[in-house]
Amino acid sequence: MAAAEDEFLPPPRLPELFDSSKQLLDEVEGATEPTGSRIVQEKVFKGLDLLDKVAKMLSQLDLFSRNEDLEEITSTDLKYLMVPAFQGALTMKQVNPRKRLDHLQQAREHFIKYLTQCHYYRVAEFELPQTKTNSAENHGAITSTAYPSLVAMASQRQAKIERYKQKKVLEHKLSTMKSAVESGQADNERVREYYLLHLQRWIDISLEEIESIDQEIKILGEKDSSREASTSNSCHQKRPPMKPFILTRNMAQAKVFGAGYPSLASMTVSDWYDQHQKHGVLPDQGIAKATPEEFRKATQQQEDQEKEEEDDEQTLQRAREWDDWKDTHPRGYGNRQNMG
């Protein structure tokens, strides 16, 4: 029954689709949950789906034409110029790492489309970023000047500062006008100013996003190239292990001076002893063995010598003791009988 009722419901109108998609974008940008959370990603996908429907309806209605100026666009239709910018902002919120490069390129196309429209209608004075074709043609000129000059860097920095200040002023004006416009109390001139300020704000946002997108695309490209290089190197056939080699100079030196360390033994100890005994060069060879009589005489001679040395020591000891006694007993010590 409910499905049958849904079939007879009128399709959503363009303003309703636009307001719903803008509300989803505001909720995604102001969400406290992580961007990769399921709740935020569902809002991102739903917002992109609604914006696709809005873009198709705008194309069917042919709401904007290159034959008209900005003043010819009605105040209530100015907000639909921001649809490509909304698409780029929500596309940047997708968090699929494998499709990150595709998302960046899609978001850049949306922002470029928005800036091209604003540049054509002269919503604000700004320099239109290069498209992919222009950047490819000027690649040689860019690489020829590897490092930008200090003047160019200073001008870019000053432009960013000016955009930031302008963005803060626009946000302050929009916050003061928002309640009156959304409640329907503002007049047509006030509504037109409100949407023109929104268009200028999204111009600044789009320029900043394109700069960050170009930097991220460059980083991803360098990462992919380094990965391909590492893969190609790993795919190379492994070289066979190198064989040990000997320098001719070292080999000749080893033949003359040896290997530089003691060689292995060429004979056993028994062979060495037999060889030296044969040539009569052992320490105990050439000394005649003593007879028993000679051994007895040598022993007796040694004993007599030791006895003489012992007697000499006793005589020397007695002489020392006598000298000591004379030192302590002078001549005439103790003889006092004939003295008066």
From Swiss-Prot:
Cysteines engaged in disulfide bonds, as pairs: none
Compositionally biased residues, Basic and acidic residues: 318-330
Sequence segments annotated as region (Disordered): 223-243, 292-340
Any one biological process term the GO annotation gives: regulation of signal transduction
Signal peptide residues on this chain, from the entry's feature table: none
Sequence ranges of Acidic residues compositional bias: 303-314
Molecular function (Gene Ontology), one example: protein phosphatase 2A binding
GO CC terms in record: cytosol
Domain of life: Eukaryota
One Pfam family hit: TAP42
Gene3D superfamilies registered for this protein in UniProt: 6.10.250.1140, TAP42-like family (1.25.40.540)
Family statement drawn from the similarity comment of this UniProt entry: Belongs to the IGBP1/TAP42 family.
UniProt protein name: Immunoglobulin-binding protein 1 family member C
Organism: Homo sapiens
The gene coding this protein: IGBP1C
